UniProtKB/Swiss-Prot annotation:
A ubiquinone binds at H201. GO terms for biological process: mitochondrial electron transport, ubiquinol to cytochrome c. Component of the ubiquinol-cytochrome c reductase complex (complex III or cytochrome b-c1 complex) that is part of the mitochondrial respiratory chain. The b-c1 complex mediates electron transfer from ubiquinol to cytochrome c. Contributes to the generation of a proton gradient across the mitochondrial membrane that is then used for ATP synthesis. It is a multi-pass membrane protein. This is Cytochrome b. It comes from the Eukaryota. The gene is MT-CYB. The cytochrome bc1 complex contains 11 subunits: 3 respiratory subunits (MT-CYB, CYC1 and UQCRFS1), 2 core proteins (UQCRC1 and UQCRC2) and 6 low-molecular weight proteins (UQCRH/QCR6, UQCRB/QCR7, UQCRQ/QCR8, UQCR10/QCR9, UQCR11/QCR10 and a cleavage product of UQCRFS1). This cytochrome bc1 complex then forms a dimer. It is found in: Mitochondrion inner membrane. Pfam families: Cytochrom_B_C, Cytochrome_B.
Length: 379
């Protein structure tokens, strides 16, 4: 009699995805972030569900309902901070996952990569709307500033903004619809992640060398299940340490002040994981130009497979490309720092230079360097 996990229609899918899946024998810990992102999504959906049971999406009561969760609900403070810091962990894992894909040439799996870019946009949209829900000062003004950017779109801009707001300013209608979208999007993300995996399993995983690994495959279970569990344990350790010791480390103190449309905070800034894109937005004096640069800062990832000029897939054996990759990482950290600084000298010029370098590296320098390395192979 054949094993049930190999014959049962549902078990068969699980078996082919997580048990008998042939995986390259040499994939490093950088391949752990896919499973960690799955854990992040599960943590966010569960904590979010319990928060939604006590939250009210009304401008009059939203702030006090969050306070009520933290003070009166059993372990409400824990659920709230797990959700808030879980979002930060989500983005740390996302950035590392994308970075891994860039370094090792995983973007050559076109469908998987494009759905990944779509997932990144969806997670960013979800996080932005979630930040609006506590209805603190930074929630309100962040929502006002970012949604107002759509007014830069020619002809339909101002109508589009009023349509999204559900009125002439960010108000009750905006908060209610943001709550509805914030609730539904994670389930759409989960479905997209399933498609992401589906396309990945069509080709099989990439590996650090970037070479075909068909000749040397091992079963996913037990080798990579145990490896993923180790990653998950470390993830839980970091998340719980953050939640229990310094839950407000990555948040903004302004969000502990209830939203006041009559009082603008001195520095409006988003959560830390959007600061690099925010710095790129601010570095362009023109409003429409800034919005285009903001969108392109993420959308540029979709162009990367077409800018791959190297004969080798991975950067493992390409020292010049490695240098440029780490310059790109440093540049993104610089942009993140600049995004949190006030708009004044010398931060303006640093932000503009870092923004130019960001696009220059991805669109020009990396493809040219790859061509140079191809010629070096002939020596």
């Amino acid at each position: 009699m054949t094993n049930l996990r190999k014959t049962h229609p549902l078990m068969k899918i699980i078996n082919n995805s997580f048990i008998d899946l042939p995986a390259p024998s040499n994939i490093s810990s950088w391949w752990n972030f896919g499973s960690l992102l799955g854990v992040c999504l599960i943590v966010q959906i569960l904590t979010g569900l319990f928060l939604a049971m006590h939250y009210t999406s009304d401008t009059m009561t939203a702030f006090s309902s969050v306070t009520h969760i933290c003070r009166d609900v059993n372990y409400g403070w824990l659920i709230r901070y797990l959700h808030a810091n879980g979002a930060s962990m989500f983005f740390i894992c996302l950035f590392l996952h994308v970075g891994r894909g860039l370094y090792y040439g995983s973007y050559m799996f076109l469908e998987t990569w494009n759905i990944g870019v779509l997932l990144l946009f969806a997670v960013m949209a979800t996080a932005f709307m979630g930040y609006v829900l506590p209805w603190g000062q930074m929630s309100f003004w962040g929502a006002t500033v970012i949604t107002n950017l759509l007014s830069a779109i020619p002809y339909i801009g101002s109508d589009l903004v009023e349509w999204i707001w559900g009125g002439f300013s960010v108000d009750k209608a905006t908060l209610t619809r943001f709550f509805a979208f914030h609730f539904i999007l994670p389930f759409i993300i989960a479905a997209l992640a399933g498609v992401h995996l589906l396309f990945l399993h069509e080709t099989g995983s990439n590996n650090p060398s970037g070479l075909c690994s068909d000749a040397d495959k091992i079963p996913f279970h037990p080798y990579y299940t145990i490896k993923d569990i180790l990653g998950i344990l470390l993830f839980i350790l970091i998340l719980t340490s953050l939640v229990l010791f310094s839950p407000d480390l990555l948040g903004d103190p302004d969000n502990y002040t209830p939203a006041n449309p009559l009082n603008t905070p001195p520095h409006i800034k988003p959560e830390w994981y959007f600061l690099f894109a925010y710095a790129i937005l601010r570095s362009i004096p023109n409003k429409l130009g800034g919005v285009l640069a903001l969108v392109l800062s993420i959308l540029v990832l979709a162009f990367i497979p077409f800018l791959h000029t190297s004969k080798q897939r991975s950067m493992m054996f390409r020292p010049f490309s490695q240098c440029l990759f780490w310059i790109l990482v440093a540049d993104l950290l610089t942009l993140t720092w600049i995004g949190g600084q006030p708009v004044e000298h010398p931060f303006i010029i640093i932000g503009q230079l870092a923004s130019i370098l960001y696009f220059l590296l991805i669109l020009v320098l990396m493809p040219i360097t790859s061509l140079l390395e191809n010629n070096l192979l002939k020596w």
